[in-house]
């Protein structure tokens, strides 16, 4: 049985976007599921789109996500070079082989002629297609133009009748009328190959058995097949993945400023959660389970379970999944990751590990942390209206009564520990013979100035310390007295 060999072939044009990362992940999983090789190849034939630093982003993303390649530009391998701009002589050699076979030809048409063809097709409302003008040139005319250094491209010579059929693992057999196939350019006038031609040549020479790409490339597949046939090469297994949508009508796109992998990490998502979520954008394991580490994905992944229908990128679902990963983190690890976010809003020397105990089960993404914690550093200005809670049966009057009762008890409390704070509050509840909320709601409001907080009255009082707790409760009493007109 032939060893499975897949390739991830990104262009160094900027950040690693979600669609690119999904292609990398599926390509990796297909190879590793069958004990095969995962190859990294850099497609930089469009030099105008090259972005400085983009190559480092590709390497870094693959490294931190655990998608370790077996061959590539940085580690070498038996079928290099693995950067297309270093393989231009190879492409030209194979393009000339196609010319010799009558499957490709030189095209010397000027930009002006090409523009007039496009304009004519636009006027007649037909799709643009090259008219094979240069196919009619004699050998002598071609040699004369080459000797005169007239700029040229090399075009594929596609038939104008009949059908080309190709098989895709997701979409099945697809037939295309050959009259719809343009004679696509194989070698550009700058000597660089087009994306399409370089792909076919490299996939063959590198022994690629499975090709994963987006469904937008389905329309190019017949032209790829005709190239494979022209060379007499075996066609790889095609796996065209459905698009990732922003919503029901709009594709997720870097052109629209949608999040890249790097953006998500900077927003506080965990790389493991992002990778897990991306795996499910178009694929499912056939059961209800949704949380998988990379090893589990390798074991379970079957490309035949990829869907045809577009996948919606659901930020709510991603946040939920990230929260599940947060909960599973060891406390020390979560604390280390959260510390930079704590320090954005907390300048005091508090016990951050205690804060992490509260947050780890409540936070979904790390970037939410500052807004959840600012009250630990400084009591925000707040309205006494938040002391009123229908379910807790609290109002301004009984809230003031509670705070005035708890203040002297807190003053006498020693040592100031979580257990003692809890006992002190629960003793007051028993003494007053009221429900917990009558005491705990106003105490928590006075300590935090917020309706919603990570942790309750006991934990907040413990973390901010005795002096700060007393100061805040005294301030709460003062506010409530002012509200009632009792000075």
Curated annotation (Swiss-Prot):
Q: Which InterPro entries match?
A: aa-tRNA-synth_I_cd-bd, aa-tRNA-synth_I_codon-bd_sub2, aa-tRNA-synth_I_CS, aa_tRNA-synth_I_cd-bd_sf, Glu-tRNA-ligase_bac/mito, Glu/Gln-tRNA-synth, Glu/Gln-tRNA-synth_Ib_cat-dom, GluQ/Sye
Q: What class of enzyme is it?
A: ligase
Q: Where in the cell is the protein located?
A: Cytoplasm
Q: What is its EC number?
A: 6.1.1.17
Any one biological process term the GO annotation gives: glutamyl-tRNA aminoacylation
Which Gene3D superfamilies does the record match to this protein?
1.10.10.350, HUPs
Q: Which UniProt keywords apply?
A: Aminoacyl-tRNA synthetase, ATP-binding, Cytoplasm, Ligase, Nucleotide-binding, Protein biosynthesis
What residue intervals hold the motif 'KMSKS' region?
251-255
Q: Which HAMAP family match?
A: Glu_tRNA_synth_type1
Subunit structure of this chain's protein: Monomer.
| Family, similarity comment | Belongs to the class-I aminoacyl-tRNA synthetase family. Glutamate--tRNA ligase type 1 subfamily.
**Protein name, UniProt field:** Glutamate--tRNA ligase
Source organism of this protein record: Clostridium kluyveri (strain ATCC 8527 / DSM 555 / NBRC 12016 / NCIMB 10680 / K1)
